[in-house]
A protein has these predicted regions:
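Adenosine-phosphate binding glycine-rich loop
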Residues: 16, 20-152, 158
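Active-site loops and adjacent core secondary-structure elements that bind or stabilize anionic groups
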Residues: 10-11, 157-170
C-alpha cells in the first residue's frame, strides 16, 4: 500500500477509506492487515476480494467484501416483480440506503460496512421491499396496482414468497 496515500487520507479524516478492489486477492492493492497496521486500526475497509479476519490490538476485525451481490439481485427482483417501466436514480439510492440500514447491532458494533453474507437473502428481501415502495411512489410499476394495494407486511411477505430458492435436491 502506498504510504503516501494512507497519510493523505489520515490528514483528511480520522478513519481513512481504503477500498482495494482489484481481483484476485493476490493482485489486491493491499491486505486488510496492512490497512489496519498503516492506519493504527482506524480505517474503513472493504475489498473486492475476500480477506481473512485479523486480530488487531486484541480485537478480531472482519474484512468486508465490497461487492454488488447485496444490491443488484434485489434491484432486479423489485423491477421484475412490479414490471417496472425503468429503474430511476431514486430506486438505486434507496437500495444503497436500505443496505446501510440493514446492519444489525452486532454488525454495527463490529464496525462492519456490510451485513454478514449469511444474511444475504434477508437483506435482498428488505432491499427489494424498499425499492418497490419507491417504484410505487414514483409511478413506475406496471402491475395494475397489485403492489400498491398491499400493506407493508403483505408486500414484504409477497416478495419473500417470490424469491428464487436454489434447490438441487432432486
Amino acid at each position: 500500500i502506498p504510504l503516501r496515500l494512507v497519510g493523505s487520507e489520515m490528514c483528511i479524516r480520522d478513519s481513512p477509506i481504503i477500498f482495494p478492489l482489484s481481483n484476485p486477492t493476490s493482485k489486491s492493492e493491499c491486505t486488510f492487515e496492512e490497512a489496519l497496521t498503516h492506519t493504527d486500526g482506524r480505517c474503513v475497509f472493504a475489498a473486492g476480494s475476500p480477506f481473512p479476519d485479523v486480530t488487531f490490538q486484541g480485537r478480531t476485525r472482519v474484512a468486508d467484501q465490497g461487492n454488488n451481490f447485496y444490491i443488484f439481485p434485489a434491484l432486479g427482483l423489485a423491477g421484475a416483480l412490479v414490471q417496472a417501466k425503468h429503474i430511476n436514480d431514486n430506486v438505486i439510492t434507496e437500495a444503497a440506503i436500505a443496505l446501510a440500514d440493514s446492519l444489525n447491532k452486532e454488525e454495527s458494533d463490529a464496525d462492519r460496512l456490510y451485513p454478514r453474507l449469511e444474511r444475504v437473502r434477508e437483506i435482498s428481501n428488505y432491499i427489494a421491499f424498499r425499492c418497490i415502495k419507491i417504484l410505487i411512489r414514483d409511478g413506475l410499476c406496471r402491475d395494475n396496482g397489485l403492489t400498491a394495494s398491499m400493506n407493508d407486511d403483505e408486500l414484504y411477505k409477497w416478495i419473500a414468497a417470490r424469491m428464487w430458492l436454489p434447490d438441487y435436491s432432486h
